Curated annotation (Swiss-Prot):
A GO MF label: L-rhamnonate dehydratase activity
PROSITE patterns: MR_MLE_1 (PS00908)
Miscellaneous notes: Reaction proceeds via a syn dehydration.
Function: Catalyzes the dehydration of L-rhamnonate to 2-keto-3-deoxy-L-rhamnonate (KDR).
Cofactor info, note text: Binds 1 Mg(2+) ion per subunit.
Site (Transition state stabilizer): E345
Name of the protein described by the UniProt record: L-rhamnonate dehydratase
Upper classification of the organism: Bacteria, Pseudomonadati, Pseudomonadota, Gammaproteobacteria, Enterobacterales
Catalytic activity as recorded in UniProt: L-rhamnonate = 2-dehydro-3-deoxy-L-rhamnonate + H2O
GO biological process: amino acid catabolic process; carbohydrate catabolic process
Assembly: Homooctamer; tetramer of dimers.
Amino acid sequence: MTLPKIKQVRAWFTGGATAEKGAGGGDYHDQGANHWIDDHIATPMSKYRDYEQLRQSFGINVLGTLVVEVEAENGQTGFAVSTAGEMGCFIVEKHLNRFIEGKCVSDIKLIHDQMLNATLYYSGSGGLVMNTISCVDLALWDLFGKVVGLPVYKLLGGAVRDEIQFYATGARPDLAKEMGFIGGKMPTHWGPHDGDAGIRKDAAMVADMREKCGEDFWLMLDCWMSQDVNYATKLAHACAPYNLKWIEECLPPQQYEGYRELKRNAPVGMMVTSGEHHGTLQSFRTLSETGIDIMQPDVGWCGGLTTLVEIAAIAKSRGQLVVPHGSSVYSHHAVITFTNTPFSEFLMTSPDCSTMRPQFDPILLNEPVPVNGRIHKSVLDKPGFGVELNRDCNLKRPYSH
């Protein structure tokens, strides 16, 4: 089989600060009013009262959705979405295009390495640039799968289990239990600036959900980089009587010493997890060395599927789990091939967590959701990532080349 070359790469955006708000899609924080994901949730900005009540007040949704599409010479296309918006479009169309167009559709690792090295001088340790590279990488995997007629998970070597089981992230673990999920992860609402009173309030929330959900249902806390080591340690011990399964991303990404100390002082049996906002392979190696229990890369932010596979290998070599942060089909096709991912995350994007809404709604068509907390591998058998781009969304292409 002669594989075609890539003819063109194109980039669109929707939502964010320079378009309509509340668009959802790849930037799942960009939701409308009265959504749980924009409620009083602890963040690094919560210490400033002006930005404490709503996360959108400090700009969590300013980037918007990036859509990258790659077209082969035979007319077939692949695409992906992430969080990078209009600025990501500029990076794709004015810089990264030179490493993509003219390459064979199978040259994914070569393109990936060239993108990483060519952006070192302005990418730092991740962020917007890495989100953009991740989106390109995922689009390339989607195109390759469609050209050869295989789902991405088979390109990675095939499934190691028949189905993926999920926990749900949202404000209502009790509803998640009714839907068949194995656990529920809640956001914390208070931080170090609230003192011991904040610890008592979040511990009371866990206690309330433990009573509602029963003894065996997993409960976890997502702290979203909002704490310090002392506060996180005290919160972990305050929640230990309620069998909290893990405490997540308590500290900013680069505080490796803090994660090591937190793991050392956490209650016996309670896991410490992080990784959502780490953006390079090297940062995950260092994070792994802290001894945390689970690494949680976002495939749309960490460097794409190509990097996620490498992160999973680092974790496996140390006996750690890798449980990616959300990311829907882009995670599904990876984790069903990882032996050290026994479960995965489903992010509830319905406003009150009462219904099953696809994570990247409305930008993806045919995006699967768990049924009774599970997705069978047969659901993932369409070529590429198995989803289509909803071109009825208000997509803008601000740059060309």
